[in-house]
């Protein structure tokens, strides 16, 4: 009898053991149905356990096997196990998070796809029934969809519907990757580009390349030649992008030149389409995949090249509890599959530039000397100006000047200083304030606490108003209401567009035109830093950054790097209007050395200075840091848990004569949700291998104590 190790879709850092009956044939990476407590759930077989004496073991039996082959490729399987060990994240959560939704249930990969024909359509008078029947006729349904709609059983019994045909996902009429591909448009490459392409593909092994600061025309020619060479060898290509808007831009461009099957992957696909594309990739029926984060985990049949567009972007960083960077996973996958990877960015991350210095990554350059273009910017000192709703009088005058010229204006707000929920009394109108900094307390709609963003104080939500003693306290959205009303007063007869949320995008059809802001007449577009990057503004000639002080006074040492990347990529939001674009920056600290050099310095000159500063103060990428996060219902327990880890690490480092630096533990808001509070402990070490080893030992010791069961914790490794 075989014992199998199984992972379940639960946030638990361990696997479970089950007996496998002799009649079943288990497969590593395949799904099985196992009993867990009072119900049956789907698990994934990780490995087999060899034990001679199994008579003393009290293990449950596996109910059934679902798959006859592994649903993960060998490379993806090894990457997922490495992720769980490196980031100390629950292994079951990782394995199930990358699967299509249908495969998380008891659903076969070769699931049937039914269509229906209407019978006796003249004999019923109910208009709703008639509409439902036509809905069934137009669409095709998977087996699992039939369970959702209860009216199917009724219609089939009454002979209103008949199953007319059934198709399998594997037998779709799709051109196979091994068929001869066609080129729609011919293109010619110069000797320099051909030489670089041959250099990349000649070795047939893992190499990492950075392409930056090059002419757009030459870059396009280079990518066309590289993709053509890969397709001629019957290889699949993965193109990673940070935003959905970039997918449709690249798709439109590739379809002009290549007549091959191209799939797009993003979070807004429905479950059925996502599963179809996952199966097509596994069986090798598509040639190119353009996708966002999760497409890096797709089970490619024969992957030959990975391209990471805008490799510096923060959108690649996962802000859940498993805080990996998709760029790093793509590099690891290329290394394991022995294929080249291209990192593309006009403002590459400091980590990539550090790898170039140490010859871990190679630099692609087509032109020796390219003229650098400097953006026209003006820095406004907020201390010397009259301010209305965060806008200075100079900025307001400049906005009116641009509107008189019939140009649209883009205002980029700092989200966390404008938009928040507060507690207000309906009767007297009093707003709850912090007693230390006199700023407004913030809250959530369904939370029972008030907190101050500046002082990191958290208190219980009062039951009544302390001013009028009335039980009429309500949660009110101060930011958006306040901004809209104030802007309408200052700019009364001007069109205002508020792009403050992405929720409306999901209801609309995704096309390349949707992401372009089409209005060319005078208007003011108000948005935030994060949301502005999801759109193109081709007619904008003036951009204003209303407040950038949070970058220069952030506790995160990478904040200046992120600001520089955002600033130098503003030109990408407006398209071809480089010379006409003006940028105004509002700040209370205009003498900051980084702001003073923005007009005259290149991005790479800034990077040299920042890298030398980090080397001087022993910061990553020269040294290594890990942040331990913990949260609990009781803040004292999460603080004690981190103190225990700190004591264990200090004792072990003294024993090994290695210096570790600690900051904390202290309270902090999470990166994804600023309303959620954690305790964090920062650990600094000169050696990555030693830090990894000592963390493993300390975590094993801490898990012996009962306090670890009352605390949720996770690690943030490779902070850069």
Curated annotation (Swiss-Prot):
Catalytic reactions on record: Couples ATP hydrolysis with the unwinding of duplex DNA by translocating in the 3'-5' direction; ATP + H2O = ADP + phosphate + H(+)
Motif (DEAH box): 309-312
Residues annotated to bind Zn(2+) 2: 434, 437, 452, 455
Pfam families reported for this sequence: PriA_3primeBD (PF17764), PriA_C (PF18074)
Residues holding ATP: 213-220
Cofactor note: Binds 2 zinc ions per subunit.
GO CC field: primosome complex
EC code(s) of this entry: 5.6.2.4
GO biological process: DNA recombination; DNA replication initiation; DNA replication, synthesis of primer; double-strand break repair
Annotated positions binding Zn(2+) 1: 425, 428, 465, 468
Keyword vocabulary terms for this entry: ATP-binding, DNA replication, DNA-binding, Helicase, Hydrolase, Isomerase, Metal-binding, Nucleotide-binding, Primosome, Zinc
GO molecular-function terms, A-Z: 3'-5' DNA helicase activity; ATP binding; ATP hydrolysis activity; DNA binding; zinc ion binding
Role summary: Initiates the restart of stalled replication forks, which reloads the replicative helicase on sites other than the origin of replication. Recognizes and binds to abandoned replication forks and remodels them to uncover a helicase loading site. Promotes assembly of the primosome at these replication forks.
Entry similarity comment: Belongs to the helicase family. PriA subfamily.
Complex and partners: Component of the replication restart primosome.
Stored NCBIfam families: priA (TIGR00595)
Protein name: Replication restart protein PriA
Species name: Buchnera aphidicola subsp. Schizaphis graminum (strain Sg)
Origin organism lineage: Bacteria, Pseudomonadati, Pseudomonadota, Gammaproteobacteria, Enterobacterales
């Amino acid at each position: 009898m075989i014992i199998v190790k199984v992972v379940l879709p639960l946030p638990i850092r361990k696997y479970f053991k089950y007996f496998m009956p002799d009649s079943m044939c288990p497969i590593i990476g395949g799904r099985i149905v196992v009993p867990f407590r009072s119900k049956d759930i789907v698990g994934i077989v990780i490995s087999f356990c060899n034990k001679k004496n199994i008579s003393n073991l009290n293990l449950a039996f596996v109910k059934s096997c679902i798959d006859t082959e592994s649903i993960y490729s060998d490379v993806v399987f090894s990457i997922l196990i490495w992720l769980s060990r490196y980031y100390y994240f629950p292994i079951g959560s990782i394995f199930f998070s990358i699967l299509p939704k249908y495969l998380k249930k008891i659903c076969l990969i070769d699931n049937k796809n039914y269509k229906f024909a209407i019978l006796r359509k003249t004999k019923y008078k109910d208009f709703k029934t008639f509409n439902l029947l036509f809905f069934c006729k137009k669409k095709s349904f998977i087996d699992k969809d039939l369970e959702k709609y209860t009216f199917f059983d009724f219609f089939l019994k009454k002979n209103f519907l008949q199953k007319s045909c059934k198709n399998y996902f594997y037998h779709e009429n799709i051109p196979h990757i091994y068929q001869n591909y066609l080129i729609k448009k011919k293109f010619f490459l110069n000797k320099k580009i051909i030489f670089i392409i041959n250099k990349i593909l000649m070795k047939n092994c893992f190499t990492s390349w950075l392409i930056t600061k090059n002419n757009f025309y030459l870059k396009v020619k280079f990518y066309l030649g590289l993709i053509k060479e890969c397709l001629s060898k019957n290889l699949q290509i993965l193109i990673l992008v940070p935003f959905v808007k970039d997918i449709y831009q690249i798709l439109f461009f590739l379809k002009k030149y290549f007549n091959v099957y191209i799939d797009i992957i993003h979070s807004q696909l429905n479950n059925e389409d996502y599963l179809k594309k996952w199966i097509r990739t596994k069986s090798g029926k598509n040639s190119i995949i353009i996708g966002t984060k999760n497409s890096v985990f797709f089970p490619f049949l024969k992957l030959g090249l990975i391209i990471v567009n805008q490799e510096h972007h923060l959108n690649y960083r996962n802000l859940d509890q498993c805080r990996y960077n998709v760029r790093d996973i793509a590099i690891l996958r290329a290394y394991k599959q022995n294929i080249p990877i291209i990192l593309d960015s006009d403002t590459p991350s400091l980590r990539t530039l550090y790898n170039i210095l140490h010859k871990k990554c190679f630099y692609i350059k087509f032109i020796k000397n390219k003229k650098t273009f400097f953006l026209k910017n003006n820095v406004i000192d907020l201390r010397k100006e009259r301010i209305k709703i965060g806008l200075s009088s100079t900025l307001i005058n400049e906005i009116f000047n641009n509107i008189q010229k019939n140009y649209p204006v883009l205002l980029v707000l700092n989200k966390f200083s404008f938009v928040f929920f507060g507690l207000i009394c309906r009767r007297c109108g009093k707003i709850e304030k912090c007693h230390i900094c006199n700023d407004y307390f913030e809250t959530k709609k369904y939370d029972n606490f008030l907190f101050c963003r500046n002082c990191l104080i958290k208190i219980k939500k009062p039951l009544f108003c302390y001013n009028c003693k009335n039980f009429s306290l309500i949660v009110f959205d101060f930011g958006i209401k306040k901004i809209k009303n104030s802007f309408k007063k200052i700019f009364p007869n001007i069109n205002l567009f508020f792009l403050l949320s992405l929720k409306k995008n999901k209801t609309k059809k995704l096309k390349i035109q949707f992401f372009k802001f089409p209005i060319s007449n005078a208007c003011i577009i108000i948005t935030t830093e994060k949301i502005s990057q999801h759109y193109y503004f081709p007619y904008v000639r003036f951009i204003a950054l209303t407040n950038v002080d949070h970058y220069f006074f952030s506790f995160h040492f990478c904040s200046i790097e992120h600001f520089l990347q955002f600033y130098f990529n503003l030109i990408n939001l407006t398209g071809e209007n480089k010379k006409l674009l003006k940028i105004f920056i509002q700040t209370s600290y205009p003498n900051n050395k980084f702001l003073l050099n923005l007009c005259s310095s290149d991005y790479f000159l800034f990077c040299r200075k920042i890298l030398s500063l980090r080397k001087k103060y022993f910061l990553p990428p020269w040294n290594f840091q890990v942040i331990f996060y913990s949260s609990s219902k009781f803040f004292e327990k999460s603080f004690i848990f981190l103190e225990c880890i700190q004591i264990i690490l200090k004792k072990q480092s003294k024993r090994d004569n290695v210096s570790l630096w600690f900051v904390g533990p202290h309270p902090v808001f999470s990166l994804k949700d600023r309303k959620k509070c954690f305790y964090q402990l920062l650990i600094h070490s000169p050696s990555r291998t030693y830090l990894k080893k000592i963390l493993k030992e300390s975590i094993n010791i801490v898990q012996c104590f009962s306090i670890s069961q009352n605390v949720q914790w996770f690690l943030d490794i490779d902070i850069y």
